[in-house]
Amino acid sequence: YPLFKEDLSLSFAQIGLITLVYQMSASVFQPLMGLFFDKRPIAWSLPIGMGFTLVGIMNLAFATNLYWLLASVFIVGIGSSVLHPEASRITFLASGGKRGLAQSLFQVGGNLGGSLGPLLVALLVAPYGRHHIALFMVFALIAIVVMIPICRWFRSYLNHIKKRPMLVAGKIERPLSSRMTVFAISILLILIFSKYIYMASLTSYYTFYLIHKFNVTVQESQLYLFIFLVATAIGTLLGGPIGDRVGRKYVIWASILGAAPFSLLMPHATLAWTIILSFCVGLMLSSAFPAILLYAQELLPTKLGLISGLFFGFAFGVAGIASAVLGNMADKFGIESVYNVCAYMPLLGLVTFFLPNLKKQKIQV
């Protein structure tokens, strides 16, 4: 973001708009893509999604104005709208019963990519110019190659299902009534709302906050962002397996509400403590999403794509809208006001108390 801001003379509000367009393009289409692939599975959908991402990266490297930049991030968002629901579905199906571990491994891959992104930008792009973003196309091409055996396995799975339709048509048990399912999903969406508003404040504006408050360089701020993103990767990796052992509800409860003390202290901390507290916040908050997604998938086991798309999409949408709103707040009231306000968002984790226990009852559908 600092490179785009400097090269194209963007305001904080325009930075927020870029994030909004990306997040909204992904969030609006993800549930639709998930529902579509629930009804019409396509074995090679993952490389199709990655192809959109590759084209978007190429355009990001050479965009010369805000509108071109917005179109580029929109294309990247379309790639995400295909990749996330489909990858989450395949992860669920291939988990072998260890759904939490499988979901965490899937999501930690994305988090690790996000963690390495700022570091690679600091090493490969910041010293040489924005056009070097095109180097990231290599990673997209590698990903497409890696997806080939996964797609072959998924094609075999789909062929197996077609030969044995009773696997699909047979009775599948749902843990809650329709009314309680809607209630539980509503609670989960409130938790996503809480988590991703605060995460948006860090992923979009943390570097600007550090530069403004502590006078660090752009490269130093990218390093500190990298530390935060590593924490999110670790938290994601831990959240799923712990949920398998102790229950999803308890992981959700501890991760979101447990981040509140750290978020409340961070606006008043020194640079060293800010880095430590941001690491703790990233670790706690990121452990929630694998548990939230699996809890929702287990509520509606016949709608894996729709649920994955809904929750990934809602998360992206909340983050996008939050980035735009927080950008305007930073322009009007200063960057520090963002963290003074967002510090209270993890307290919404209290609503986890109302989540039903999925082990209590099972209702056939």
Q: Model-predicted segments: where are they?
A:
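Helix-loop-helix hairpin linking two adjacent transmembrane segments in secondary transporters
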Residues: 105-156
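C-terminal transmembrane helical hairpin of 12-TM major facilitator-type secondary transporters
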Residues: 243-292
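Residue-level signature of mid-helix packing/kink "hotspots" within the transmembrane helices
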Residues: 23-31, 114-115, 229-237, 319-320
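Cytoplasmic helix-loop-helix junction between adjacent transmembrane helices
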Residues: 72-109
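Helix-to-loop junctions at the C-terminal end of transmembrane segments
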Residues: 29-41, 236-247, 330-331
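Extracytoplasmic gate region of multi-pass secondary transporters
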Residues: 181-229, 233
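Structural signature of the two symmetry-related core transmembrane helices
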Residues: 44-59, 250-264, 343
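Conserved MFS/SLC helix-loop-helix module at the cytosolic interface between two early adjacent transmembrane helices
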Residues: 28-66
